[in-house]
Design a protein with these regions (language model features):
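An alpha-helical support segment within catalytic cores of ATP-dependent transferases
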Residues: 92, 100-124
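Catalytic-loop of the protein kinase fold
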Residues: 124-134, 139
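Active-site Asp-x-Gly
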Residues: 10, 16-33, 94-96, 106-110, ...
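Conserved ATP-binding subdomain of kinase catalytic cores across diverse folds
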Residues: 1-94, 124
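A glycine-rich phosphate-binding loop feature that marks nucleotide/adenosyl-phosphate handling sites
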Residues: 80-82, 136-139, 189-197
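Conserved protein kinase catalytic/activation segment
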Residues: 136-148
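Regulatory N- and C-terminal appendages and interdomain linkers associated
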Residues: 106, 114, 121, 145, ...
Length: 246
C-alpha cells in the first residue's frame, strides 16, 4: 500500500496567542456564531479557532496544488490529523529538510532561486507563507517542496503580510547564504511586494533581488541620470588631472 504522512496539530493552548492573532487577522469566518465565540474566547470559540487553523492549511495546500509551487498533496483532515503525501528522496526515504543538508555554492543558489520563485508565485495568488525557513522546506530528488502552511495569510487582508514576507525571504537568504554569501543581501521580498502593490507581479515576472531600502517607490530614471552625471563629472576631473600633469 501507499505510505502517507500524518500531521498531528499542537493543542491551541501551546500556541502563542500573539502569533495566532497576527496570523488570523483578515481570515473570514462564515459562521457568525463561531466568529462571536472566537472573539469572546469561550471554550467553543477556542475549538472553532483551532478548527480554522487546521482548515487554513488544507485550503492553502489546495490553492497551491493548482500552481507551480511544489507542496504535498492532501488526502483529508480527520479529527485534527491531516493526511498528506509523503515526500521522499531518490532512495524512497523521508526527504530531508533544507536545514539538514549541506550544499555547494551552486546548489545553494539553485535552491534559493527555486524557493524565492515559489514565494513569488504564492504572492501572485495573494498568499504569504508567514513562517518560511529552512525548517519548512523539504528537498527531494526534484528540488524544494514547501510545507507547514496553517499560518499562511492573505496578503491583501493582513496588515502584517509584508513584514512576514520580508522575514520569510530573509530566513531563506540567511540559510542559503551560509553556502553562497552573495545571497545574504537579496532584496526579492521588497521587490516583489512593491510589484504586488502595483498589480504588476505575475508568475513569470523576473526578479533581480535588488530594491531600495525605503518604502517609497524610487524614480529609477532620476537615479540613473544622477549616477551618469557623477560618472561624467569624475571623468572630467580625471581628464583635468591628467592635463595638469602633462
Amino acid at each position: 500500500g501507499e505510505i502517507r504522512c500524518a500531521k498531528v496539530y499542537k493543542d491551541v493552548t501551546t500556541r502563542s496567542f500573539k502569533q495566532a492573532v497576527q496570523y488570523q487577522e483578515g481570515r473570514k469566518v462564515r459562521n457568525t456564531r463561531s466568529a462571536r465565540a472566537m472573539e469572546r474566547g469561550s471554550k467553543f470559540g477556542k475549538q472553532q479557532q483551532e478548527h480554522t487553523w487546521h482548515t487554513a492549511e488544507v485550503d492553502a495546500l489546495g490553492l497551491l496544488a493548482n500552481t507551480e509551487v511544489r507542496v504535498p498533496e492532501t488526502h483529508g483532515l480527520f479529527d485534527g490529523v491531516l493526511l498528506m503525501e509523503l515526500i521522499t528522496d531518490a532512495d524512497g526515504y523521508v526527504a530531508p529538510r533544507l536545514a539538514d543538508i549541506s550544499m555547494t555554492s551552486e546548489e545553494a543558489i539553485i535552491n534559493h532561486v527555486t524557493i524565492i520563485d515559489f514565494v513569488k508565485k504564492m504572492l501572485c495568488i495573494g498568499m504569504v507563507h508567514g513562517d518560511l525557513s529552512e525548517f519548512n522546506v523539504l528537498v527531494d530528488a526534484n528540488g524544494p517542496v514547501i510545507i507547514d502552511l496553517p499560518q499562511a495569510v492573505d496578503a491583501s487582508a493582513n496588515n502584517h503580510a509584508q513584514e512576514m514576507l520580508v522575514r520569510d525571504v530573509r530566513n531563506i537568504n540567511n540559510y542559503c547564504g551560509q553556502f553562497a554569501p552573495e545571497l545574504l543581501n537579496n532584496r526579492s521580498a521588497h521587490e516583489m511586494w512593491a510589484l504586488y502593490g502595483q498589480s504588476q507581479l505575475y508568475e513569470d515576472t523576473p526578479l533581480i533581488g535588488i530594491h531600495p531600502e525605503d518604502t517609497h517607490q524610487a524614480d529609477v530614471g532620476a537615479v540613473v541620470s544622477e549616477i551618469q552625471s557623477v560618472l561624467a563629472e569624475e571623468a572630467k576631473r580625471q581628464q583635468r588631472l591628467n592635463e595638469s600633469e602633462d
